[in-house]
UniProtKB/Swiss-Prot annotation:
Record-given protein name: ATP synthase epsilon chain
UniProt xrefs under InterPro entries: ATP_F1_dsu/esu_C_sf (IPR036794), ATP_synth_F1_dsu/esu (IPR001469), ATP_synth_F1_dsu/esu_N (IPR020546), ATP_synth_F1_esu_C (IPR020547), ATPsynth_dsu/esu_N (IPR036771)
CDD domains, per the entry: F1-ATPase_delta
Annotated localization: Cell inner membrane
Organism taxonomic ancestry: Bacteria, Pseudomonadati, Pseudomonadota, Gammaproteobacteria, Pseudomonadales
Amino acid sequence: MAMTVHCDVVSAEEKIYSGLVEMLIATGTEGELGIQYGHAPLLSELKPGAVRIIKQGGSEEILYVSGGYLEVQPNLVTLMADTAVRAKDVDEAAALEAQKQAEKALANKTGEFEYSRAAAELAEAAAQLRTIQKLRKHLR
């Protein structure tokens, strides 16, 4: 039986997951993070994108987070997300529309603030679409 660690995934709206995991995989600002039992203590900012939770027993769940923080302690992993959604609940049509609108806003930039906002919206829409693609690969 694989070694496990307790993991909590929370957002401002709700608790998304709480239970034992064999591994949690997320993207921090410095790159991919794979957290397993025995990992050194860590605090990292998260980038928007997919989070893979490999539960006790090997089943996997994929989430989308819009950013947040990951804290690793000896017996607890806590992911505090700005927004967290199960990948199966991400609306692909809405993400594609948001991507198109952000690309349009980037092309018609009127000021630095609008450009920065559009770039952030584009990055978030792209991250949502990548999460949907990962979920589709996982389901095959």
